[in-house]
């Protein structure tokens, strides 16, 4: 077991920086603006997500990967953000945007990176602290995730069904199945190499843990939260909007 002095020395060595991929269009939201720029109480979801990540003082800098097409949304946004938040040019895919941010973080001296979704604004501080604690000390990294609770069904894949109704092929055993969330925390250079090795355009690269798994790592699963919901569909936005408004009211009272 490490002594207190050894643990303190290790914390001095570690340099944690965050990467938030925010270059996506969010087409499934059926909104006229990218989902990360949807507003709740005069603030964007991206601002809430950045604020959530910065609740842990160990996060030294935040690199937000954005698209040039989002320039109009960034003009005012840049004025309201802390100086430790920086924008970098993202790519056409999530993985390309993450890779761009990780490369900048590494160039700035990051030993570890924390990757968080731009449209996951209700991250609890307790969960953030837990995943950072494990991610910094576990060489395989760590991610937030929640055990799958509902029954899972595999659908029959048929292109000849004229009714358009999808039918069940079989049930899937949910034992040992977890639903991945973010943040995901890894050694910075190791994650960069993993994404480059797997290929940023590989369709199987759905999150950072996928790249690490591709290279033989088994990241730790840290219990997340149902509130740590990613806005993907309109009903998701309704949920996080209500939570954020409730939190804002609590802070005012």
From Swiss-Prot:
The record marks 174, 230 as: Positions MEP for the nucleophilic attack. Pfam families: IspD. InterPro entries: IspD, IspD/TarI, IspD/TarI_cytidylyltransf_bact, ISPD_synthase_CS, Nucleotide-diphossugar_trans. SUPFAM superfamilies: Nucleotide-diphospho-sugar transferases. It comes from the Bacteria. Transmembrane segments: none annotated. Keywords: Isoprene biosynthesis, Nucleotidyltransferase, Transferase. One of its GO terms (biological process) is isopentenyl diphosphate biosynthetic process, methylerythritol 4-phosphate pathway. GO terms for molecular function: 2-C-methyl-D-erythritol 4-phosphate cytidylyltransferase activity. Its EC number is 2.7.7.60. Pathway: Isoprenoid biosynthesis; isopentenyl diphosphate biosynthesis via DXP pathway; isopentenyl diphosphate from 1-deoxy-D-xylulose 5-phosphate: step 2/6. The record marks 28, 35 as: Transition state stabilizer. The keyword Transferase applies. It catalyses: 2-C-methyl-D-erythritol 4-phosphate + CTP + H(+) = 4-CDP-2-C-methyl-D-erythritol + diphosphate. Catalyzes the formation of 4-diphosphocytidyl-2-C-methyl-D-erythritol from CTP and 2-C-methyl-D-erythritol 4-phosphate (MEP). Belongs to the IspD/TarI cytidylyltransferase family. IspD subfamily. HAMAP family: IspD (MF_00108). This is 2-C-methyl-D-erythritol 4-phosphate cytidylyltransferase. It comes from Idiomarina loihiensis (strain ATCC BAA-735 / DSM 15497 / L2-TR).
């Amino acid at each position: 077991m490490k002594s207190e002095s050894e643990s303190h020395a290790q914390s001095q060595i570690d340099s944690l920086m965050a990467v938030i991929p925010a270059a996506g269009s969010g087409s499934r939201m059926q909104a006229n603006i990218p989902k990360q720029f949807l507003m709740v109480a005069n603030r964007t979801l991206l601002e809430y997500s950045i604020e959530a990540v910065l609740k842990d003082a160990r996060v030294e800098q935040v690199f937000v990967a954005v698209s040039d097409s989002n320039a109009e949304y960034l003009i005012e946004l840049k004025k309201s953000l802390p100086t430790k938040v920086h924008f970098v040019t993202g790519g056409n895919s999530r993985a390309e945007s993450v890779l761009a941010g990780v490369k900048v973080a590494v160039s700035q001296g990051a030993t570890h990176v924390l990757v968080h979704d731009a449209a996951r604004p209700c991250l609890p501080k307790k969960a953030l602290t837990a995943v950072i604690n494990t991610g910094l000390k576990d060489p395989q990294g760590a991610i937030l995730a929640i055990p799958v609770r509902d029954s899972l069904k595999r659908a029959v894949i048929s292109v000849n069904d004229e009714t358009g109704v999808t039918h069940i092929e079989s049930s899937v055993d949910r034992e040992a199945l977890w639903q991945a969330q973010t943040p995901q925390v890894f050694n910075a250079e190791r994650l960069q190499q993993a994404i480059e090795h797997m290929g940023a355009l590989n369709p199987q690269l759905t999150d950072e843990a996928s790249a690490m798994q591709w290279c033989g790592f088994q990241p730790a699963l840290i219990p997340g939260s149902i509130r740590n919901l990613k806005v993907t569909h309109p009903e998701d936005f309704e949920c996080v909007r209500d939570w954020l408004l409730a939190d804002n009211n609590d802070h005012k009272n």
